[in-house]
């Protein structure tokens, strides 16, 4: 097999499949931030998007190729359906990258052929090699995926894969598109491909799976035992429906259980060489970044990166951990970059100390962004005695990583209490330029603020979720507000942090509305194209 026998390749699709999560829409700048973090993490391939889907997707893939796709950086990949228009757009967007890959796909299951593609098996067998060969004429590194491989007839699947490899595919990816298979079934599927596709030695076997039954990670680990050498995954497991296989869970499973998996890669069981290229100390920071930018909070009991992953409530467990961590912990929290050794800054801290700490925390800011974040830091430091790493993260995300402020909050004031009626007065600068002021009453101060905003913005929506969390302890702590709203079936998120919860609430809601407004403007110009796998 033409595989990296010494390790497993990590193919991250957070920016493509992960962004298909409801409400996870990202701006170009946010995608760049995540791409930089993924490169720092050490992923081998970044699937940057679906260039043909929209001008915004094309621009994002192109910019990631320009800035992250360096000679020493990851391979930058673009998704394309098995059509010349899609493939040509992907090749064009990927041109700036030193190492680039086109990932093209076509369904092979009978249910997809009959109900979605309206094509016969013979037609699919003709299209696949033709489109792979066309992609190969533009880019040397080609990945082909038979969509819904998990429910495809194995004998037909073998024929399609053989044809794709003969036409130039260098990676063959096997998607469990609907998360239907069990580990034993998926492992057998991979073994069947390894044993029955005559030219499989000319390609790397990759796996891609969804988590509808909660089995994606288990399926992938079984696939590794049967010959898979590339794992397609996302940070925090985000993705359509129940999500994708979680990168952090796969990497740490291979890291912690290295001696178990080593023999399947032809290594001695006691080999200490890493099984992946991932720098695990960047896992936690990358997880936090993706969570903040997508608005998708990580559940507390989530493996590896959840808030409770290294917490112990039971007295027996606490006693054991204090005596020896290994009594109840199979990995060190510091191995994923989670540490309590925080540096505390204050209002006398200078710009250099501030910038240095941000770099240590994994932030890569331009001079302008750093200046803006430092101004905001000083404002918060005047209200708080100490600024922790969590505060810094919230400040940067709130100040720098926001959608364009098409509607900008200028002033907000509320009055409330017993027995008065909660009333909000606010002023917003609109995209057209002038300021508009509105006054509204509500059941509470936040409700009044949101009603006043709606008077000005006038974008019909349904508020699905409003949550407030404290960034750190203390009555003067920063409060972080997250908002999710729905418009015409599409979910948009907003977040903001401030020591004043009313201000944070207003900015978070406006952030979601700004995303909605921008999306509506784009869709009027270019209706989006939806991918799958």
Curated annotation (Swiss-Prot):
Task: Give the UniProt keywords, A-Z.
Answer: Amino-acid biosynthesis, Branched-chain amino acid biosynthesis, Cytoplasm, Leucine biosynthesis, Manganese, Metal-binding, Transferase
Reaction(s) catalysed by this chain's protein: 3-methyl-2-oxobutanoate + acetyl-CoA + H2O = (2S)-2-isopropylmalate + CoA + H(+)
Where in this protein does the record put region Regulatory domain?
408-533
Tell me which SUPFAM superfamilies the record gives. 2-isopropylmalate synthase LeuA, allosteric (dimerisation) domain, Aldolase
Gene Ontology biological-process annotations:
L-leucine biosynthetic process
- Cytoplasm among the record's keywords? yes
User: Per its Swiss-Prot or TrEMBL entry, what cofactor is needed?
Assistant: Mn(2+)
Report the top EC class in one word.
transferase
Q: Which domain of life is it from?
A: Bacteria
Q: Which GO terms describe its molecular function?
A: 2-isopropylmalate synthase activity; acetyl-CoA C-acetyltransferase activity; manganese ion binding
Which E.C. number(s) belong to this protein?
A: 2.3.3.13
Amino-acid positions noted as binding Mn(2+) in the UniProt annotation, renumbered to this chain: 17, 208, 210, 244
Query: What's in the GO CC field?
Result: cytoplasm
Major subcellular location class = cytoplasm
Where, per UniProt, does this protein localize?
Cytoplasm
Residue ranges of every copy of the Pyruvate carboxyltransferase domain listed in the record: 8-269
Quaternary form? Homodimer.
Q: Which NCBIfam families match?
A: leuA_bact, PRK00915.1-3
The record's similarity note reads: Belongs to the alpha-IPM synthase/homocitrate synthase family. LeuA type 1 subfamily.
Record function comment: Catalyzes the condensation of the acetyl group of acetyl-CoA with 3-methyl-2-oxobutanoate (2-ketoisovalerate) to form 3-carboxy-3-hydroxy-4-methylpentanoate (2-isopropylmalate).
Note the PANTHER family from the entry: 2-ISOPROPYLMALATE SYNTHASE 1, CHLOROPLASTIC-RELATED, HOMOCITRATE SYNTHASE-RELATED
Q: What is this protein called?
A: 2-isopropylmalate synthase
Tell me which species this is from.
Synechocystis sp. (strain ATCC 27184 / PCC 6803 / Kazusa)
- Gene responsible for this protein: leuA
